[in-house]
Structure formats: C-alpha cells, structure tokens
Amino acid sequence: MADDLGDEWWTQGDNSDVPEVEEETEHAEEKQPIKSTPKKRKVEKQIPDATKKKKATVKKECFITQERSEEKPDNESNKNKKRRKKKKTITDVLTSSKPVPGSPVDLVSLLKTYHSQTRSVIEQEELTLQDSCFLSCNDLTHSLSSYLKEVCPKWAKMQKQHTQTSSVVLLIVCGSALRTIDLIKQLVTFKGQAKVLKLFAKHIKVEEQIKSLSKGVTHIAVGTPGRICALLEKEGLTVQGLRYLVLDWNYRDQKQRRMVDVPEVKGDLLKMMDQGLIQSCREGTVKIGLF
C-alpha cells in the first residue's frame, strides 16, 4: 500500500505540511500584533486619559479663578457706582449746611407757593403778610423765655386783662408732642401765674381739649399745627383773644429737620394759617414771631 502511493503521498504530505506551518506562522504573526497592540493601546489610553482629566481640571480651575478675579473688579466698580449714585437725603443736606435763623421772607414765600396752587392772583394778594405783621425774630441766641420777654414786654398786664374762654393770648406752634412738653418746661421763668395748655394729638382727644378750653381761662397754649388746626375748624379754639403767634421755626430734631422740613407738619401749618390767623395778622390784632 505504501509502495502504491509512491512519492505522491510524500510530496503531497510535504506540500500539505508546508502551508499548514506557513498558515500557523502567519496566524501567529497576525495574532501577536493584535494581542500586543490593544494592550499597548489600552495602557496608552488609560494613562493619558487620567493625565488629560487632571490637566483639564487644572485648566478649568485656572479659568474659573481667572473669571472670578475678573469679576471682582467689576463688582467693586459697580458698588462704587452705586455709592456714587446714592442721592442725598434732607438730613445730609441740612447737616452739611450751617443753621440760618428764620426770617419773615421765609414764611411769606412758603405761604405764597402754597396759595399759588389753590388761589387766584387777587386772593393771593389778600393773603400776603406784610412786614408789620411780624415781631423781631430769634437770632439763635435766645432761649424761649428770654425771647418772649423781649417780644412781649407787657405780658403781666395782658395776662390779667385776658378773661375769654376758648381762646389764648399766646399760641406757640411746634413740630411734635415731645417738643411741646420741652417748650412748656422752658416757659417756667416767663409765664408767671398764667395757665398753660398742651395741644397735641397723642393720647388726648379733641373733645377733651375743647372742654378744657371752654371751662376756664387759658393764657398760653403750646401744640402741634395738626391739632391746633382741628380745634380751630371745630371752633373749640378761637382767635378772638389771641395776640401773639410764635412759630418754633429754627428748632431741628435728631435728623436736623425743622418744622417746615417735614411734609406732613408743613401741610398742617399752612392749613392752620388759613383758619383765620392770616386775616387776624393783616388786621393787626395778631403778631407773628419766628423763634
């Protein structure tokens, strides 16, 4: 059997073995780079990925810090702009300015601007206060008692002659209830035997004040323009026996505001003046003093 096969078997066997070896070598060669390359690639991919992430985070942190550093000066500049744009209040203006004593011109101009909105030109002329309507003004050196002694030299005589109820001889107008109490304390050396009444809205009803004015003779009243205006409107207080109207013009509160610097108080003061006080001043029966 072996002889019959002859050389062909061997040749075929030899030829058949060669390609198998070649195929195996080729497969081995093909397998080696496939196995080696992915391993190398995996290692190469893992290392740069980690480093790249670190570098990216570092770069991001750098950019964030740069952005924050760039934002800070912008915020500071915006704050400075806001500070610059802040408007001055009345308190800031008044504290920076020197106190100037009030004059008759101040009250006349205030009444003129008020009446120009609601009155005709002819009516405005009839409501204009002349210089003869005013007493000498406080030059910021007087206390209340010393000022009243100067402008009311015959106070003792006038006090005795006053017999009317629901009326006073001296009416002092100020901006608040606390200031009212303070001024009443300052009247001790001036008032003598005169009866003093406080007129403000805090804890005291209008009806109670009307009763107290009608019961007996009151010589001096100190109060706020809002309550005095309400009493004049209800005729609980009249101007028949009134001779002196003193406005607490120059006093400044904790915020450096005068009575006419507070809008509500100023409005009440102007309304109060229209309740027969301007007319009495023009007739010469009442004199105005700016303390």
UniProtKB/Swiss-Prot annotation:
<dbReference type="InterPro" id="IPR027417">
    <property type="entry name" value="P-loop_NTPase"/>
</dbReference>
<feature type="region of interest" description="Disordered">
    <location>
        <begin position="1"/>
        <end position="96"/>
    </location>
</feature>
<feature type="compositionally biased region" description="Acidic residues">
    <location>
        <begin position="17"/>
        <end position="27"/>
    </location>
</feature>
<feature type="compositionally biased region" description="Basic and acidic residues">
    <location>
        <begin position="58"/>
        <end position="79"/>
    </location>
</feature>
<comment type="similarity">
    <text>Belongs to the CMS1 family.</text>
</comment>
<protein>
    <recommendedName>
        <fullName>Protein CMSS1</fullName>
    </recommendedName>
</protein>
<dbReference type="InterPro" id="IPR032704">
    <property type="entry name" value="Cms1"/>
</dbReference>
<dbReference type="Pfam" id="PF14617">
    <property type="entry name" value="CMS1"/>
</dbReference>
